Amino acid sequence: MKYLPILLLLLMACQPITETKTTKKSMLDFKYPYKTKFVDLSNDVKVAYIDEGKGDKTLIFIHGLGSYLPAWQKNIAVLKADYRCIAMDLPGYPKSSKGDDTYNMTFFAEVILEMIDELKLKNSVLIGHSMGGQIAMMAALKSPELLQSLILIDPAGIERFTPQEATILKSLVTQEAVKNTPTEQIKKNFDINFAAGVTPEDALFMYNDRLYMRDTELEYEHYCRMIPKCIAGMLDEPVFDNLKNIKMPTLLLFGEQDYLIPNKYFHADLTTESVATTAQSQIINSQLFMVPNAGHFAMWDNSTAVNGHIQAFLKK
């Protein structure tokens, strides 16, 4: 397991299941900052989402691997003043349905696009973080006519991996590995997402919710099966070679202290900024900003800067 500490975007996924469960709990018990709604889609998929604010544009927030919709609350609190803001739990994640799905990037992108159609959303802007950024790019490539623009925050899918590297990464994150990660490693996995190298006090609820997951029995078993599928999906469906086909206005935001992009083990010659500038060079109509005092969770670490960049971009 010598590779585990340096896995790109995989560290958040692994959770322990070492405690004996004595009470019936559910991820539906999680406290969300806004009222949760649900929309039924095809193939028995049900998506939990929040819908706040009004405006001429609809901002659709897509979380990353192992995350959930509350990760966007610092952004929605500000942006809902001028825009309609919709954030969801992707299928398989806390309050959404948990079926026997593929959980690859195509699956998630199709869910996003169907949701746009089902809710009759107009002037839609996808805002994706990490894996959510890769999903947003996939959706933009599949149905650009449904979208107005893209905002990608520390997105996955830009850094490329060889088949051998991908095989190693996938082999390390199995259902059993997800279950058996020690509690102290969970905390380290959260800490590495933030610029200070420690989870800030106002983000500890994410860590606590993750620990709570262990006692949700069948829901957690599903989560442990799903995470490896998500990882395989990111690695098996790269978008880099198709980035030049994204024509819509795109905002790229990367935290200057992103410790997950690039992968330090496989790509020690790269920097976060070099990955970011590569993305900008490939997406024709894009602009890039490096966010100071921000790690992989840039939208949380420096929400003021991120919100400012989003507002300026949307007003153009």
Whereabouts are the PLM-identified features?
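Active-site loop/oxyanion-hole signature of alpha/beta-hydrolase fold enzymes
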Residues: Y32, S42-D44, I50, L90-I127, ...
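Short beta-strand/loop motif that positions the catalytic acidic residue
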Residues: I246, L252-F254
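Flexible "cap/lid" loop of the alpha/beta hydrolase fold
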Residues: L141, L150-T181
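Short glycine-enriched nucleophile-adjacent loop
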Residues: G133-P144, L150
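Conserved HGGG/HGGXW glycine-rich cap/lid loop of the alpha/beta-hydrolase fold
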Residues: V45, I50-K95
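Alpha/beta-hydrolase fold catalytic core
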Residues: Y3-K57, D82-Y83, I284-Q287, L314-K316
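Conserved alpha/beta-hydrolase catalytic His-Asp/Glu region
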Residues: T181-K244
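Catalytic active-site module of serine/aspartate enzymes centered on a nucleophile-bearing elbow/loop
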Residues: Q282-K316
